[in-house]
Amino acid sequence: MNQTRIDFRQAKFLISAPDIAHLDKHLPGDVGVEIAFAGRSNAGKSSALNALTEQKSLARTSKTPGRTQLINVFELDAQRRLVDLPGYGFAKVPLEMKHKWQNALGEYLQKRACLSGVVVLMDIRHPLKDLDRQMIEWSVASEIPVLALLTKADKLGQSEKMKTVNAVRKELAEFGDWVSVEPFSALKGTGKPKVLAILDAWCHPDWLVEELEQAED
Protein backbone atom coordinates (compact mmCIF):
# COMPACT_ATOMS: atom_id res chain seq x y z
CA MET A 1 0.00 0.00 0.00
CA ASN A 2 1.35 3.42 -0.99
CA GLN A 3 1.77 5.61 2.12
CA THR A 4 3.58 8.49 0.39
CA ARG A 5 2.07 11.88 -0.36
CA ILE A 6 3.28 11.67 -3.95
CA ASP A 7 2.00 8.83 -6.12
CA PHE A 8 5.18 7.84 -7.94
CA ARG A 9 3.15 5.62 -10.24
CA GLN A 10 1.94 8.75 -12.00
CA ALA A 11 5.43 9.54 -13.34
CA LYS A 12 5.41 10.25 -17.06
CA PHE A 13 8.10 10.98 -19.61
CA LEU A 14 8.64 14.71 -20.09
CA ILE A 15 11.74 15.32 -22.20
CA SER A 16 15.14 13.95 -23.23
CA ALA A 17 18.28 16.05 -23.41
CA PRO A 18 20.69 14.66 -26.03
CA ASP A 19 23.84 16.38 -24.80
CA ILE A 20 24.72 16.46 -21.14
CA ALA A 21 27.14 19.33 -21.75
CA HIS A 22 24.20 21.60 -22.62
CA LEU A 23 21.81 20.55 -19.91
CA ASP A 24 20.28 23.98 -19.36
CA LYS A 25 19.08 24.19 -22.97
CA HIS A 26 17.00 21.05 -22.68
CA LEU A 27 15.81 20.76 -19.10
CA PRO A 28 12.79 22.63 -17.75
CA GLY A 29 13.44 25.90 -15.90
CA ASP A 30 15.42 25.66 -12.68
CA VAL A 31 12.28 25.74 -10.52
CA GLY A 32 10.30 23.29 -8.42
CA VAL A 33 11.99 20.09 -7.28
CA GLU A 34 14.22 17.61 -9.10
CA ILE A 35 15.52 14.29 -7.83
CA ALA A 36 18.42 12.89 -9.83
CA PHE A 37 19.28 9.23 -10.34
CA ALA A 38 22.94 8.55 -11.05
CA GLY A 39 25.06 5.44 -11.17
CA ARG A 40 27.49 3.30 -13.08
CA SER A 41 26.21 1.89 -16.34
CA ASN A 42 25.59 -1.58 -14.87
CA ALA A 43 24.02 -0.46 -11.57
CA GLY A 44 20.42 -1.25 -12.56
CA LYS A 45 19.27 2.37 -12.68
CA SER A 46 16.52 1.91 -15.27
CA SER A 47 15.19 -1.20 -13.52
CA ALA A 48 15.07 0.68 -10.22
CA LEU A 49 13.16 3.60 -11.74
CA ASN A 50 10.67 1.22 -13.34
CA ALA A 51 10.20 -0.67 -10.06
CA LEU A 52 9.74 2.48 -7.97
CA THR A 53 7.13 3.87 -10.37
CA GLU A 54 5.54 0.46 -11.03
CA GLN A 55 5.91 1.01 -14.76
CA LYS A 56 7.58 -1.66 -16.86
CA SER A 57 9.01 0.66 -19.48
CA LEU A 58 9.16 4.18 -18.02
CA ALA A 59 12.96 4.04 -18.21
CA ARG A 60 14.30 1.99 -21.08
CA THR A 61 16.59 -0.83 -20.04
CA SER A 62 19.45 -2.00 -22.22
CA LYS A 63 21.48 -5.19 -22.22
CA THR A 64 24.44 -3.10 -23.39
CA PRO A 65 25.66 -1.00 -20.43
CA GLY A 66 26.68 2.51 -21.39
CA ARG A 67 24.34 2.72 -24.36
CA THR A 68 22.01 5.31 -22.83
CA GLN A 69 23.64 8.73 -23.20
CA LEU A 70 20.46 10.78 -22.89
CA ILE A 71 19.29 12.66 -19.85
CA ASN A 72 15.68 11.59 -19.44
CA VAL A 73 13.30 13.72 -17.39
CA PHE A 74 10.08 12.33 -15.91
CA GLU A 75 7.34 14.50 -14.45
CA LEU A 76 5.56 13.60 -11.21
CA ASP A 77 3.45 16.76 -11.22
CA ALA A 78 3.80 20.40 -12.23
CA GLN A 79 6.34 21.03 -9.44
CA ARG A 80 8.32 17.78 -9.24
CA ARG A 81 10.56 15.81 -11.61
CA LEU A 82 12.79 12.74 -11.65
CA VAL A 83 15.97 13.05 -13.72
CA ASP A 84 17.65 9.92 -15.08
CA LEU A 85 21.29 10.85 -15.70
CA PRO A 86 23.50 8.88 -18.13
CA GLY A 87 25.36 5.93 -16.66
CA TYR A 88 29.02 6.57 -15.98
CA GLY A 89 32.18 4.51 -15.84
CA PHE A 90 31.53 1.90 -18.54
CA ALA A 91 34.79 0.54 -19.96
CA LYS A 92 33.78 0.63 -23.65
CA VAL A 93 32.82 4.31 -23.60
CA PRO A 94 35.62 6.50 -25.07
CA LEU A 95 37.72 8.26 -22.45
CA GLU A 96 36.94 11.72 -23.87
CA MET A 97 33.20 11.04 -23.51
CA LYS A 98 33.71 9.80 -19.94
CA HIS A 99 35.44 13.05 -19.01
CA LYS A 100 32.72 15.07 -20.73
CA TRP A 101 30.00 13.24 -18.77
CA GLN A 102 31.83 13.57 -15.48
CA ASN A 103 32.46 17.30 -15.90
CA ALA A 104 28.85 17.95 -16.88
CA LEU A 105 27.48 15.79 -14.06
CA GLY A 106 29.59 17.72 -11.59
CA GLU A 107 28.34 21.02 -13.00
CA TYR A 108 24.72 19.83 -12.82
CA LEU A 109 25.10 18.79 -9.18
CA GLN A 110 26.78 22.04 -8.23
CA LYS A 111 24.61 24.54 -10.12
CA ARG A 112 21.09 23.11 -10.36
CA ALA A 113 19.25 25.02 -7.62
CA CYS A 114 16.08 22.91 -7.77
CA LEU A 115 17.97 19.66 -7.11
CA SER A 116 16.48 18.31 -3.88
CA GLY A 117 18.26 14.96 -3.65
CA VAL A 118 20.48 12.51 -5.52
CA VAL A 119 20.09 8.75 -5.63
CA VAL A 120 23.47 7.14 -6.32
CA LEU A 121 22.82 3.56 -7.39
CA MET A 122 25.51 0.91 -6.91
CA ASP A 123 25.50 -2.83 -7.48
CA ILE A 124 25.60 -4.22 -3.93
CA ARG A 125 28.33 -6.65 -5.03
CA HIS A 126 30.59 -3.79 -6.22
CA PRO A 127 29.84 -0.69 -4.12
CA LEU A 128 31.71 2.59 -3.77
CA LYS A 129 33.82 2.68 -6.88
CA ASP A 130 35.79 5.91 -7.36
CA LEU A 131 33.10 7.61 -9.47
CA ASP A 132 30.37 6.63 -6.99
CA ARG A 133 32.28 8.29 -4.19
CA GLN A 134 32.94 11.32 -6.37
CA MET A 135 29.20 11.72 -7.06
CA ILE A 136 28.49 11.50 -3.34
CA GLU A 137 31.23 14.00 -2.47
CA TRP A 138 30.05 16.46 -5.14
CA SER A 139 26.48 16.25 -3.89
CA VAL A 140 27.31 16.70 -0.21
CA ALA A 141 29.67 19.58 -1.04
CA SER A 142 26.66 21.25 -2.68
CA GLU A 143 24.53 20.46 0.40
CA ILE A 144 22.34 18.01 -1.51
CA PRO A 145 21.25 14.89 0.41
CA VAL A 146 22.20 11.53 -1.05
CA LEU A 147 20.60 8.10 -0.98
CA ALA A 148 23.27 5.48 -1.67
CA LEU A 149 21.10 2.71 -3.08
CA LEU A 150 22.65 -0.76 -3.10
CA THR A 151 20.86 -2.43 -5.99
CA LYS A 152 20.49 -6.10 -6.93
CA ALA A 153 20.23 -6.99 -3.24
CA ASP A 154 18.56 -10.27 -4.23
CA LYS A 155 21.94 -11.44 -5.55
CA LEU A 156 23.23 -11.85 -1.97
CA GLY A 157 22.01 -13.87 0.97
CA GLN A 158 20.59 -12.00 3.97
CA SER A 159 23.77 -12.22 6.04
CA GLU A 160 26.07 -11.08 3.23
CA LYS A 161 23.62 -8.35 2.24
CA MET A 162 23.53 -6.79 5.72
CA LYS A 163 27.28 -7.16 6.09
CA THR A 164 27.74 -5.13 2.90
CA VAL A 165 25.12 -2.54 3.87
CA ASN A 166 26.76 -2.01 7.26
CA ALA A 167 30.22 -1.77 5.68
CA VAL A 168 29.03 0.90 3.24
CA ARG A 169 27.28 2.80 6.04
CA LYS A 170 30.51 2.77 8.04
CA GLU A 171 32.48 3.93 5.00
CA LEU A 172 30.10 6.84 4.39
CA ALA A 173 29.60 7.77 8.05
CA GLU A 174 31.91 10.77 7.59
CA PHE A 175 29.11 12.50 5.64
CA GLY A 176 26.70 12.30 8.59
CA ASP A 177 23.02 12.82 7.90
CA TRP A 178 23.70 13.97 4.33
CA VAL A 179 23.97 10.35 3.17
CA SER A 180 21.69 7.39 3.86
CA VAL A 181 22.33 3.83 2.67
CA GLU A 182 19.65 1.30 1.77
CA PRO A 183 19.59 -2.10 0.04
CA PHE A 184 17.23 -2.45 -2.92
CA SER A 185 16.00 -5.11 -5.30
CA ALA A 186 13.95 -4.16 -8.34
CA LEU A 187 13.15 -7.85 -8.79
CA LYS A 188 11.96 -8.61 -5.24
CA GLY A 189 10.87 -5.14 -4.10
CA THR A 190 13.35 -5.17 -1.22
CA GLY A 191 13.72 -1.70 0.30
CA LYS A 192 11.04 -0.09 -1.87
CA PRO A 193 8.92 1.43 0.97
CA LYS A 194 12.00 3.05 2.57
CA VAL A 195 13.21 4.42 -0.74
CA LEU A 196 9.80 5.88 -1.61
CA ALA A 197 9.59 7.50 1.84
CA ILE A 198 12.96 9.21 1.29
CA LEU A 199 12.00 10.38 -2.20
CA ASP A 200 8.68 11.65 -0.87
CA ALA A 201 10.44 13.71 1.80
CA TRP A 202 12.73 15.19 -0.86
CA CYS A 203 9.65 16.09 -2.90
CA HIS A 204 8.41 18.23 0.00
CA PRO A 205 11.20 20.64 1.01
CA ASP A 206 10.01 23.29 3.46
CA TRP A 207 10.28 26.13 0.95
CA LEU A 208 8.05 24.36 -1.60
CA VAL A 209 5.43 23.42 0.99
CA GLU A 210 5.28 27.06 2.13
CA GLU A 211 5.09 28.29 -1.47
CA LEU A 212 2.21 25.94 -2.31
CA GLU A 213 0.35 26.84 0.90
CA GLN A 214 0.67 30.55 0.11
CA ALA A 215 -0.64 29.92 -3.41
CA GLU A 216 -3.74 28.26 -1.92
CA ASP A 217 -4.50 31.18 0.44
Curated annotation (Swiss-Prot):
PROSITE patterns: G_ENGB (PS51706). Coiled coil: none annotated. GO terms for biological process: division septum assembly. GO terms for cellular component: cytosol. InterPro entries: G_ENGB_dom, GTP-bd, GTP-bd_ribosome_bio_YsxC, P-loop_NTPase. Keywords: Cell cycle, Cell division, GTP-binding, Magnesium, Metal-binding, Nucleotide-binding, Septation. Transmembrane segments: none annotated. It holds the Pfam family MMR_HSR1. Mg(2+) binds at residues 46, 68. Residues 31-205 form the EngB-type G domain. GTP binds at residues 39-46, 66-70, 84-87, 151-154, 184-186. Its cofactor is Mg(2+). GO terms for molecular function: GTP binding; metal ion binding. Belongs to the TRAFAC class TrmE-Era-EngA-EngB-Septin-like GTPase superfamily. EngB GTPase family. Necessary for normal cell division and for the maintenance of normal septation. This is Probable GTP-binding protein EngB. It comes from Shewanella amazonensis (strain ATCC BAA-1098 / SB2B). The gene is engB.
